[in-house]
Amino acid sequence: MNKLCQRLAIVVLLALAACQPSFEVYDLRCEGLVEPLGIDSTQPHFSWKIASDKPMQQAAYEIEVGPELWKSGKVDSDRQVMVPYAGQPLMSRQQTRWRVRIWNGEGKASAWSPWQRLGVGIIGDDRLKGEYIGAVPGEGRASLLRKDFEVKKTGTALLYVNSLGYHEAYLNGEKVSDAVLQPAVSQLDKRSLIVVYDVSHLIRKGFNELCLAIGSGWYKKATFDAVYDGALVKAELDVDGEPQVWTDASWEGGWNGYSDLGDWRPHGFGGELLDNRADPDWAPVDVVKIEDITASMQMCEPCRIQEIVTPVFMERVGEDQWLVDFGKVVNALLDVEMPGLQAGDQVKIFYSDASADSFDPEICGYDVFIAAGEGDHFQNCFNHHIFRYVLFEGLKQAPEELQAYRMRTDFATGASFSSSDPELNAIHDLVLRTMENLAFDGYMVDCASIERLGYGGDGNASAQSLQTVAGVSPLFLNWLQAWADSQKEDGGLPHTAPNPYKAGGGPYWCSFIVQAPWRVYMNYADTRPMERFYPNMKHWLDYVDAYTVDGLLKQWPTPPTPPYRWWYLGDWAAPEGVNVQDPESIDLVNNCALAQSYEELVRMAQVMNLEADEADYRQRLEALRKRIHETFYHDGLYASGSQVDMIYPLLVGVVPDGLKEQVVAKLKERTETLYNGHLATGLVGIPVLTEWVTRAGECDWMYGMLKQHGYPGYLHMIDNGATGVWEHWDGRRSRLHNCFNGIGSWFYQALGGIVALEPGYRKVKIAPQIPAGLEWVEVTQPTPYGPITVKRQGQEVSYTVPVGVTVEEND
């Protein structure tokens, strides 16, 4: 009888299991972020992915917020990316939660997702309590600020920190977060960012101590005209929505032992001095009035440590000198213990990204450590370095516990590429590794060592590559806000954002304000940048119109003192033998960049149903295309006939249909005869070339150029020991740079054949391009719906796509 009951129970359980849906939702996000505590919107957007053990499509969803705030009810829709909240507007500081469930086409519902936290930040007319405070101004000193306070009860405790400069927060001696270099960047003369931390696990009933360590970072007189010679901070800690403590004159402060050694201008990022003997010597803080700077919520992920890199080699190179090789170039914080020192002993630490024989402090910086005689441990706190090699001077015993903490903005990744060609794999990995190192602090820099600026040209060059391999919509939203804040009253834009001082570039650099929002929309189905910054795009094009002569953009002036930009570049950092200074080439490149901006404005106006704008920009585009061809086409060549001069007109629709074959043939002929089959272009040309060869199916030509081992080329870099992409093809200046990362998307969209037909990859075409000699390829590309994987062996192609993505059948 017992055996019969057991068998019946098993049958019942199996039957129940068969009735359960075999799908679930995962990776829930609000505004593109995982459980954000302080968003800047009262009506956010929700996204989720679906895991299923068999093919399916979402037929309906249901979202609950609160759950008392909003219940969508069952909504018949397959939408699962950036689904808008439709309840009553949320309020400033409101903390709530949300969840979702879905139905498949057979009417079966998934389980509800786990509840996800959702918090609204300090928005609208709400303001943080308290005042900006600082301490120990001058000499680059970082400060430690503290306050004892008492709470009557514990609960949900949130700490809001708005710092001008970097900060770290400690409650009762414990660091409140594993984030580093907080907050993200902003245009600090216009906007600062508020970061919120959940400190519920650290607060206790009764007396507590809150400490804030702050370092000036970008907030300096020489960069953003700082009103105080040091970092400042305003902070507030709430328990269950009730303020418990905030920054004001009752706090005390002192020196935490760190000092900034640089002015944060080009070649001047220096490093940090740490005096391990320092005592805070507590004194009253300075209260500083800050006006005309908007404080808004940080809407991108923080920087976090992604990898701990340890040395591959270390040797003594002098009586008190030690050389360390970490094996690859990284953007990192150094951590080291230094034994055998006496109090007051000084150790200098030098860095190099290029050579074990050359340590230039103006390139990769340096640090200084002053020993206490015991517990001598150094770690970067408010600065970082680009390095492969480290040289210690003043240390007689070998350094111990050496680690490099490679960090970046904590976005989601998951891309991979492999093929039958190890050299091609090496190029892909070089580019991917470089981009990850350069995407930190809520923007992407040219190089983190020499200039550390968010150049628009470098951004345009790498945007499609980075957005192909990572979930960086929040990062681009933060970066684009800095561009909008940098715009001048006449509509002019600088070449970098944030914009602490003048920097070189040209119209292609400024067009980031147009190109980046369109790419964010196509790659993530996120309309926020497009909608938020559309007025800035139009204002910039009005500025451009002022310097249009006979239908063509011409040289614009260097703005008056203080200048916020210089130069009027076409292409940049092209190899030797390519004249990027040719005036006709410069005008052609800049007018093609303008045509590309008009193309994207037409598309964005379509999406936003702005019919008059769409018609206006379409007319401007067609007129400009005609003028470019009439002006720059001569006997089969455009302008100087360089690769970028030939390809950019092809990309933006300038070349008449009847001339395309002739122009392409001439391009290839000149590549062989003038450039020996090599890439022969620079920062602007690489992404332009990549996008054109992908669209045109020119995989054999591209593959042939990438396979060249001599100068210039990626294999030339690798053959000469590169572990990051160089700033110049010949290796000058930075060895970890954003100039030439524009080829990254080609591995996925051409060789993998993954082409987005609808925003966010909701509908795709999968048609791998097959260059001769490449036997097989396997790629995985992350999308807002989940990963797409494509495998090609010979002519045979297989793929898997996530739920929510449909594949267009090939003809």
Regions found by a protein language model. Give the residues of each.
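Extracellular/oxidizing-compartment recognition motifs
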Residues: 23-449, 474-475, 494-498, 528, ...
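Hydrophobic h-region of N-terminal signal peptides that target proteins for export
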Residues: 11-19
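Non-catalytic C-terminal accessory modules of carbohydrate-active enzymes
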Residues: 229-232, 246, 250-276, 297-302, ...
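C-terminal capping/lid segments that line or modulate ligand- or cofactor-binding pockets
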Residues: 269-274, 450-451, 469, 513, ...
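Active-site acid/base region of carbohydrate-active enzymes
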Residues: 166, 232, 246-253, 399-430, ...
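Sec-dependent signal peptide recognition
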Residues: 2-11
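Alpha-helical support elements that line or immediately flank enzyme active sites
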Residues: 157, 161, 333-351, 393, ...
